[in-house]
Design a protein with these regions (language model features):
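Conserved glycine-rich beta-strand-loop-beta hairpin in the small C-terminal domain of fold type I
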Residues: 264, 280-289, 300-313
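Active-site pre-lysine segment of PLP-dependent enzymes
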Residues: 122, 129, 140-153, 165-188, ...
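Active-site PLP-lysine loop of aminotransferase-like
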Residues: 210, 214-229, 239-256, 338-339
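Structural signature of PLP-dependent enzymes
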Residues: 244-248, 266-289
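N-terminal small-domain helix-loop-helix segment of the aminotransferase-like
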Residues: 2-88, 371-372
Length: 372
């Protein structure tokens, strides 16, 4: 089996530890262990004192009952037994695609998007066609393109919402139409929902609550600010959950027992995390928008209150060279747009510490001025 190099992950693996001002990541500023445990007034010592004599044995195969119940409560129609714990959303996507896609299948994805959603199907022998998001259309999903691409042999439509890297959302009306199109050919719809928006005016809806063959993947990495515990999940109906169980045994035995505990703790206190993160997004997005308004060499379609944005750069050199030179000269890290097959752009993660964002943007402006 052949698979393409994973552009974003390869870039970050090579360069992120050299960054002084990392404005490339797409998570919201990570919680410390003390902050996470302290959400309900518990201190770290107390939290671990209760667990110090527990054996570090295998955990729950599919996630603890408490975990499954907390995750199921995030949806309107999903039963706890149909939640399967995974190693982050990447593990959830891998599980779903590994279970469903076969050589000769037809898959529809979007571009740009998270590379996993189309290169895993390609590696399994599927043909992949793309709905191309266009900057001049504010990166909005084109339903007419989707209708033209879907065919009787289409097995699955693989998307993400909000989109990585652009931060744009598949709103309720669009999602319902996607389900309607998929239903005409009995195709599955997988949506990576790891960037569920924090302020959406009721426009965000999970695919699993819209479509009987919908697959929602998600994790605690982005919206919930704890990527380090590596906990994600699939949410589906009962038939798909049963299919996934068989394949999951080959990809993951269980999550860590402490990770499951911390995940449950986070989900039980999710309103406090979301309140904190709404504040970070609102304040930092205002900083980003003001910077863009004053920066003549940058354009931005504003993200939908999610933690990733995608800027257009007016530069002469290729974006990868630009980003390497920027990092080496200033310590500022971006992800070049070419990692998403869109050159002359860059992913800018604006939900880091405010001081990091402000200094990073200032240095980026100084570097852009030198390009004249």
């Amino acid at each position: 089996m052949e698979i393409a190099n994973f552009g974003v992950e390869e870039w970050l693996n090579k360069w992120e530890k050299k960054a002084v001002y990392d404005i490339a990541q797409s998570s919201i500023e990570a919680l410390t262990l003390d902050e996470l445990v302290g959400l309900d007034g518990t201190n770290v010592s107390e939290f671990f004192e209760k667990r110090k004599n527990e054996p570090l044995d295998y955990g729950w195969i599919e996630g603890s009952d408490a975990f499954k119940q907390e995750v199921a409560s995030l949806y309107q129609t999903v039963d706890p037994e149909n939640i399967l714990q995974t190693n982050g959303a990447t593990g959830a996507n891998l599980l779903a695609l590994y279970a469903l896609v076969e050589a000769g299948d037809h898959v529809v994805s979007m571009l740009p998007t998270y590379q996993q959603l189309y290169d895993i199907p390609k590696s399994l022998g599927a043909t992949v066609d793309f709905v191309h998001l266009k900057e001049e259309a504010d990166w909005q999903f084109d339903l007419e393109q989707l209708e033209a691409l879907v065919k009787p042999e289409t097995k699955i439509i693989c998307l993400n919402s909000a989109n990585n890297p652009t931060g744009t959302l598949l709103n309720r009306k669009t999602l319902e139409k996607i389900a309607e199109i998929a239903r005409t050919v009995d195709a599955y719809v997988l949506i990576d929902e790891v960037y569920a928006p924090l302020t959406d005016n009721g426009e965000f809806l999970s695919i699993v609550d819209v479509y009987e063959k919908g697959i929602a993947t998600n994790s605690l990495s982005k919206t919930y600010s704890i990527p380090g515990i590596r906990i994600g999940w699939t949410a589906t109906g009962p038939e798909l959950a049963e299919v996934f169980r068989k394949y999951r045994d080959y990809t993951m035995i269980c999550g860590g027992v402490l990770s499951d505990d911390l995940a449950v703790h986070a989900l039980k206190n999710k309103e406090k995390i979301l309140e904190r993160n709404k504040k970070i997004i609102t304040e930092n997005l205002a900083i980003l928008k003001q910077w863009v308004a004053n920066e003549p060499k940058v354009e931005l379609v504003a993200p939908n209150y999610v933690s990733t944005s995608f800027i257009k750069l007016t530069i002469e050199e290729d974006d990868q060279t630009f980003c390497i030179n920027l990092l080496e000269e200033t310590g500022v890290l971006l992800v070049p747009g070419s990692a998403f097959d869109l050159p002359k752009h860059a992913r800018l993660g604006y939900c880091c510490k405010k001081e990091t964002l402000e200094k990073g943007l200032s240095l980026l402006s100084e570097f852009l001025k030198k390009q004249d």
